[in-house]
Regions:
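Bacterial Sec-exported substrate-binding components of ABC uptake systems
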Residues: 2-85, 209-245, 306-309, 322, ...
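Structural recognition of the beta-strand scaffold that forms the well-ordered cores
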Residues: 76-77, 96-97, 144-148, 174-176, ...
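Short, structured coil segments at secondary-structure junctions
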Residues: 91, 140, 169-171, 268-269, ...
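A short, structured surface patch at a secondary-structure boundary
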Residues: 74-160, 165-166, 273-276, 283, ...
Length: 389
């Protein structure tokens, strides 16, 4: 996609009334420049700051500052990472939309009593035929668009900056940052870690205590895992790849790169087997593939394979992907195949609740002798944090 040097300035202040309340939005959408223009804004030290007794502000790159006089009652989402945050904070019922339902894996909620989201009720934003329609945003009439506008202008390549301005003025402001990966050349503004972004969302819905409680569970889980890890030189490396059914080629991700969907692997000390190669990660400008010969040349300790569509059982994963790799003339020579170290790669969009389950799952898969007990965090404790008012 051609890059441009456009810096789009949102309205500095706008007012609109919904259901007796007002949300005042002001933001800057950073363009994707080749010319070196300054496209970032300094973030505030706190996730939210009060501007008066009745309003509060939340600031996030690249969208800038949004001022609220009440907690949003309806929120248009796109990235499941952020929707998982809202569910974690007890505000899943505010979510109006999602990019595509099939990309939002929700089976982990089944283990948390009282935690759920009705996927069928969410408006699906992306359409193969028509892209993303502005009319859908007018129809939803949400209080806030919790998404980086670059989802619409770059990743989905459906909107212009003028379209973003129109919806921001006519419906509601945007707030968000693409955090699921950091391989796109246009992402030259600040990147947020999973919990940095989560803290911003907690500020939006005014759930500081609930956020801190979940962060405590996360920190305790990480501490328990780190205490049980083997020495660094005894930890395996891995290739994280997208694999179609019966794969003949693979699309690489970089474990060493930033991205919320890889944070759990880094916590577990899984290193990137692409580290000493010139292979780059998947992005809007690079969707190159690699073949079995390249895999064998690298010969990683393990393979983490992602796939399209809904979550699959281990049996379905074996049947559609792994069996083909094992039977392939070159694939069968891989150390990961010989040692039975081929695992599902986990969701592309991984929020804070996903992250806890992924930490636990991969700790058991990679280090079964050290994490034989299975559960590392308390499901009931987590569910109570989410559901109690």
């Amino acid at each position: 996609m051609a890059q441009d040097a456009t810096t789009y300035e949102m309205p500095t202040r706008r007012d609109f009334v919904k259901g007796g309340g007002t949300i005042v939005g002001g933001a800057l959408l950073a363009g994707c420049a080749d010319g070196g223009a300054d496209l970032t804004r300094t973030a505030t030290e706190s996730a939210a700051s009060a501007t008066s007794d009745e309003t509060y502000t939340v600031r996030m790159e690249p969208t800038g500052t949004v001022t609220f006089d009440r907690v949003p009652e309806t929120i248009a989402g796109c990235d499941p990472t952020y929707i998982d945050m809202l569910v974690a904070l007890g505000h899943g019922d505010t979510v109006e939309s999602i990019r595509t339902r099939r990309q939002y894996l929700t089976t982990h909620y089944d283990e948390l009593d009282g935690v759920s989201i009705d996927l069928s009720s969410l408006t699906q934003l992306a359409s193969k035929k028509s892209g993303v329609s502005k009319e859908v945003f007018y129809e939803m009439d949400a209080d806030l668009h919790l998404m980086d506008p670059h989802w619409l202008t770059r990743i989905l390549d459906s909107w212009s900056d003028a379209d973003v301005e129109e919806i921001s003025k006519g419906v509601a402001p945007f707030l968000g940052n693409v955090i699921f990966r950091r391989t796109d050349p246009w992402h030259d503004y600040r990147y947020y870690t999973l919990y940095e972004a989560f803290e911003k969302v907690a500020a939006v819905v005014q759930e500081r205590e609930r956020f801190e409680a979940i962060r405590s569970i996360h920190e305790e889980t990480v501490e328990a895992i780190e205490a049980g890890l083997p020495a660094a030189d005894q930890r395996p490396d891995a290739l994280l790849l997208y694999a179609p059914d019966e794969p003949e080629e693979f699309y690489p991700y970089r474990l060493s790169g930033k991205g919320a969907n890889k944070e759990h692997f880094r916590t577990l000390g899984i290193t990137d087997a692409f580290a000493d190669t010139d292979v780059s990660g998947f992005s809007t400008s690079d969707s190159g593939s690699i073949d079995y010969e390249t895999l064998l040349e690298i010969d990683p300790d393990s393979l983490l394979l992602r796939y399209r569509g809904k979550a699959r059982t281990r049996e379905a994963f074996e049947e559609s992907i792994v069996s083909h790799v094992r039977e392939h003339e070159v694939g069968s020579q891989l150390s990961a195949v010989k040692n039975d170290q081929i695992f599902r790669g986990g969701p592309i969009f991984c929020g804070p609740l996903h992250n806890l389950f992924m930490l636990e799952r991969y700790a058991g898969l990679y280090y079964p002798d050290r994490f034989a007990d299975g559960q590392i965090f308390d499901r009931d404790r987590l569910a109570n944090v989410i559901t109690e008012r």
